[in-house]
Amino acid sequence: FYCELLPFLGLVKVYDGNNFVYHVGGRTALGIQRCAEEYQDERFVQNRVGLHHLCLRARSREDVDKAAEKLRSMGAHIDRGPIEREFAPGYYFFVFEDPDGIRLEINHIPGKGLLATAVPMSPSSDPDWDQNP
């Protein structure tokens, strides 16, 4: 999955071992390791210890759309989008899952995005949006 997706997103595979692959981009690197055999039947659970989701930035809205189309052609589950949201001016994104259920996002935010203002990000008007169930 990642060996097809990451080069499409501009990352270069610099290591491809038996159980580990490493891709590098301009300011991003991802190392992905095959899970141990005893865990192969498990799925990712967002509220367990670890990652909530990983977001990759695109250079344009068109690149977001192209990535979504690529993932559809790969049979990936697209959870939502591409859509625009109020997280930041021009915030355009989609959320998808890899084959293990790990949630990822690809977005485009024009200009400096969330770094353009001192106002903190507010993904929801619900003050408890980030509380675990």
Regions found by a protein language model. Name each.
Residues 44-133:
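Vicinal oxygen chelate
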Residues 33, 55-57, 81-82, 107:
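A cross-family glycoside hydrolase active-site/sugar-binding cleft signature
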